[in-house]
């Protein structure tokens, strides 16, 4: 796997997490990542880190937390041009739906609700159409025990089946809150097998998918905010001078 470049796009630093950006970067480099996304929740906004180090990429990630779809749309407009990766913290049916229906959202993370996995065929189809990746956060497996771990595995199997059926981008992430939550790419790929992800799928979810996310031309000069975009009139509209 040496020829692959691996990226973890959801690593929380202070104030969300317990470690500084510098400490997390150092550990991630040691574990073999080519780059990471430094994240905070929108409710715990800290300084957005984006300075890379030689041979290592650092991306600005925000995990939006909203109480309703209307507030989520407002947060998307606020943060889209400020970050490299825009994730939505799900867990509510309305928020999950609003996230996957919005092409300005990159990732839906923690979609499971008290009633179930939080995803269905309709939402998976919308995620595919709008190129919104579904995150499989490995901390749900390594940081939980008993019934909670069983539920996480069950939800991940549901996400996997829906993602395969509707060609939804799949993303693997540690969702680490400290250096102790980080895992090497090889370990994450191995853990993904617990819920049925094939090795080639896991490699893509940790390499090609995150790279495609950060390479999106989200900061287009014509993008103003959610629901507002500038269009240049064509010559036929302007008419002949």
From Swiss-Prot:
Compartment annotation: Cytoplasm
Catalyzed reactions per annotation: Endonucleolytic cleavage of RNA, removing 5'-extranucleotides from tRNA precursor
GO cellular component: cytoplasm; ribonuclease P complex
Main location: cytoplasm
Top-level taxon of the source organism: Archaea
Record-listed E.C. numbers: 3.1.26.5
EC supergroup of this enzyme: hydrolase
GO biological process: tRNA 5'-leader removal
Keywords of this entry: Cytoplasm, Endonuclease, Hydrolase, Nuclease, tRNA processing
InterPro entries assigned to the protein according to its UniProt record, in alphabetical order: Pol/histidinol_Pase-like, RNase_P_comp-3_arc, RNase_P_p30
Family, per entry: Belongs to the eukaryotic/archaeal RNase P protein component 3 family.
HAMAP family: RNase_P_3 (MF_00756)
Functional description taken from the UniProt entry: Part of ribonuclease P, a protein complex that generates mature tRNA molecules by cleaving their 5'-ends.
Subunit architecture: Consists of a catalytic RNA component and at least 4-5 protein subunits.
This protein's name: Ribonuclease P protein component 3
Annotated gene: rnp3
């Amino acid at each position: 796997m040496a020829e692959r470049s691996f990226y973890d796009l959801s690593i929380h630093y202070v104030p969300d997490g317990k470690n500084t950006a510098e400490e997390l970067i150092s550990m991630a480099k040691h574990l073999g990542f080519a780059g990471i996304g430094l994240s905070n929740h929108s409710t715990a906004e800290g300084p957005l880190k984006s300075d890379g180090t030689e041979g290592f990429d650092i991306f600005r990630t925000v995990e939006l937390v909203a109480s309703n779809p209307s507030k989520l749309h407002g947060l998307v407009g606020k943060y889209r041009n400020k970050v490299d990766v825009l994730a939505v913290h799900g867990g509510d049916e309305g928020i999950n739906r609003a996230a996957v229906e919005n092409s300005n959202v990159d990732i839906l993370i923690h979609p499971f609700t008290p009633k179930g996995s939080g995803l269905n065929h309709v939402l998976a189809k919308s995620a595919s159409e709008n190129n919104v990746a579904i995150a499989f956060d490995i901390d749900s497996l390594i940081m939980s025990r008993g019934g909670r771990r069983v539920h996480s595995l069950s939800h991940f199997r549901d996400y996997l089946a829906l993602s395969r059926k509707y060609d939804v981008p799949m993303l693997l992430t540690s969702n680490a809150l400290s250096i102790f939550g980080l895992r090497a790419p090889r370990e994450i790929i191995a853990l993904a097998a617990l819920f049925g992800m094939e090795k080639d799928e896991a490699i893509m979810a940790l390499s090609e998918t995150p790279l495609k996310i950060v390479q999106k031309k989200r900061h287009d000069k014509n993008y103003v905010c959610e629901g507002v975009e500038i269009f240049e009139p064509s010559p036929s509209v302007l008419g002949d001078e």
